[in-house]
């Protein structure tokens, strides 16, 4: 699944990126490309761990609906 990603620039340089739907799924890097590469690794590990523990994955449709509600507010 392709969950929405939020990217923040860091004041000291570099970036932090997160997937809000996947609690704790975030990464940082010096460049945008490095940050996104790291985030994809973390996402894969997050999903693998969730499957190992038989956790239900967040619905992509629900996450998109949340974003639409937030942007309309």
From Swiss-Prot:
Stored Gene3D superfamilies: 3.30.160.250
Domain of life, source organism: Bacteria
Taxonomic lineage: Bacteria, Bacillati, Cyanobacteriota, Cyanophyceae, Synechococcales
Classification via SUPFAM superfamilies: TTHA1013/TTHA0281-like
Pfam families (UniProt xref): UPF0150
Assigned protein family: Belongs to the UPF0150 family.
Example of a GO biological process term: regulation of DNA-templated transcription
Name the UniProt record assigns to this protein: UPF0150 protein ssl0259
């Amino acid at each position: 699944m392709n969950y929405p990603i939020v990217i923040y620039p860091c004041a000291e340089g570099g970036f932090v990126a997160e997937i809000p739907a996947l609690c704790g799924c975030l990464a940082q890097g010096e460049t945008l490309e490095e940050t996104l590469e790291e985030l994809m690794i973390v996402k894969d590990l997050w999903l693998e761990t969730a499957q190992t523990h038989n956790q239900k994955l967040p619905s992509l449709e629900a996450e998109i609906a949340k974003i639409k509600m937030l942007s309309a507010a």
